[in-house]
Structure formats: C-alpha cells, structure tokens
Swiss-Prot record:
Organism taxonomic ancestry: Bacteria, Pseudomonadati, Pseudomonadota, Gammaproteobacteria, Pasteurellales
Protein's name in the database: Large ribosomal subunit protein uL22
Alphabetized CDD domains for the sequence: Ribosomal_L22
Gene name for this UniProt entry: rplV
Function: This protein binds specifically to 23S rRNA; its binding is stimulated by other ribosomal proteins, e.g. L4, L17, and L20. It is important during the early stages of 50S assembly. It makes multiple contacts with different domains of the 23S rRNA in the assembled 50S subunit and ribosome. The globular domain of the protein is located near the polypeptide exit tunnel on the outside of the subunit, while an extended beta-hairpin is found that lines the wall of the exit tunnel in the center of the 70S ribosome.
UniProt keyword rRNA-binding present: yes
Biological processes annotated in GO: response to antibiotic; translation
Keyword Ribosomal protein applies: yes
GO cellular component: cytosolic large ribosomal subunit
Organism name: Haemophilus influenzae (strain ATCC 51907 / DSM 11121 / KW20 / Rd)
Length: 110
C-alpha cells in the first residue's frame, strides 16, 4: 500500500532539497529517519517532517506496520518564487528570488 505526504511551498530551493532527498530514496524508513537526523542541512529537517507525516498517514489511514515501510518515491518540485528587491548603490536595485519547493514523499510496504 502506498501512502503519500506533501509539504507544499517549503521555503528552500528545490536544488538544495533534492540533495537531501537523494540520500534516503529507496531506504527503509527507520534508516531514512536516522540519516536525516544527522544530516546537517536545513532541508533535512523539512524532509524529515514530511517523512514522519507519511509514516503516520500509513499507520493511521492504512494500518501499515512501520517496520515494513520503505521510501518508495521521494521527489522535490519547484514552487513559486517570491520576488524581492534589494537596494544597491547609486539608485540601482537587484532582484532577489526567494525560492520555494514542493516536497513529496511516498512510503510503501512492498
């Protein structure tokens, strides 16, 4: 049984979150949580929270056994970017892109 959890509009760039997602793809959830706990990245905390949500969804909604679950799929898509302005010298301005991403985790007992 596949169970999904999503975090939409996460305040990190998709490029940075994908580095973390690649670490846990295909792993058992216990091992994935351990890896995320000791990964020193902001995105690791965000991905860990989504993974914990997916585990809880599988247990509550589908009655799955946690020991059998593994990360079947995990992917990070780009969300909308917030455009901001940073003033520079001599009346100029630079545009700052505050990027967001959509983190999706699918756990399965197969």
């Amino acid at each position: 049984m596949e169970t999904i959890a999503k975090h939409r509009y996460a305040r990190t760039s998709a490029q940075k979150a994908r580095l973390v997602a690649d670490l846990i793809r295909g792993k058992k959830v216990a091992q994935a949580l351990e890896i995320l706990t000791f990964t020193n990245k902001k995105a690791a905390a965000l991905v860990k929270k989504v993974l914990e949500s997916a585990i809880a969804n599988a247990e509550h909604n589908d009655g799955a056994d946690i020991d059998d679950l593994k990360v079947a799929k995990i992917f990070v898509d780009e969300g909308p970017s917030m455009k901001r302005v940073m003033p520079r010298a001599k009346g100029r301005a630079d545009r700052i892109l505050k990027r967001t991403s959509h983190i999706t985790v699918v756990v399965s007992d197969r």
